[in-house]
Amino acid sequence: MSEPVDPEAPLDEEPTDLDPTEAEPEEPGSSALRSFLGLFIVPLLVVLLCVAIFIGFGWIAYDRQSTRDYLGDLESGWKPRRVQAAYELSKILVSDPRALDKEPGAKAQVRRLFQEADDPEMRRYLALVLGRTGDREALPLLTAAANDEDDRTRIYALWAMGILGDARARDPLAKALSDEDSGIRKTAAFALGELRDPSAIPLLQPRLDDAVTDVRWNTALSLARLGSDAGVPVLETMVDRRLLAQVPDITPDQQEEAMLGAIRALAAVSGPAHKELFERLAKEDPNLKVRQAAMEAEKAVSSGR
């Protein structure tokens, strides 16, 4: 259907004086057109409005569903509902990691659906659900998914392995550190830090010289989480706005995130040596969150915490 003509479009020239009492002759077919508009277009618009209202209230109600409701929706025959349910469950588990413990058979159900799912988006969210439940039986499934044909599914699987926190994930994650895809390397570096296993330190250290900035940053942050100061030189670059500005395509939000993470990491592994840096950032940095993080780091260092 063609786009409607704008009834308020300006005329090309000023109108001449017309007698308002004189009606213009009706063009042939205009009556039929009005009938068509009245009988078809207007009712159609009403129907569309009702559908929009119905969908809107449906989503509001959906947002209030329980964990059990979402588990049921994972079995739905409608793909969008299944994917949305997996996404909602992954969010619930962030605030309540034991949410599925309250539902008998839920973990086994998620493992089964993860194995059966052939939709990449569904598998990605289910991977996060598996990781956030702390279900150790899910590790073999996530390890296999780390070799999936879909790169984004691989990233979610690696991420979930880190969230799971099972030390047995160390070797599969270490293998991913040498992948040709920088997104895979970055996620593997992050996930190894989440394992809190110091034996991962020597596996991570070579990635401090990675050609990709994101990989170096995540490696340095993970090393700090593991108690190693090997990444301090990289962390120092992450709080230098002059160097951050040279990173291609970096956004202000990403700069802020990098600085906040680096400040906390430096405070944890090299605190006293960077006291002056924290003081300077607390006074001079233009970002409020960065100043606040630097003040907290300086206070922690001064108190010996």
Residue ranges and their predicted role:
Residues 85, 126, 157, 188, ...:
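Conserved hydrophobic register position within alpha-solenoid helical repeats
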Residues 61-73, 95-115, 135-147, 166-178, ...:
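Amphipathic alpha-helical scaffolding segments comprising HEAT/armadillo-like alpha-solenoid repeats
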Residues 1-29:
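N-terminal intrinsically disordered, acidic low-complexity segments at the extreme N-terminus
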Residues 38-58:
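Hydrophobic membrane-insertion alpha-helices, especially the h-region
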Residues 77-78, 118-119, 149-150, 180-181, ...:
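Short inter-helical turns and helix N-cap capping residues of alpha-solenoid HEAT/ARM repeat scaffolds
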Residues 75-79, 84-135, 182, 190, ...:
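Extracytoplasmic/periplasmic/luminal assembly and interaction segments
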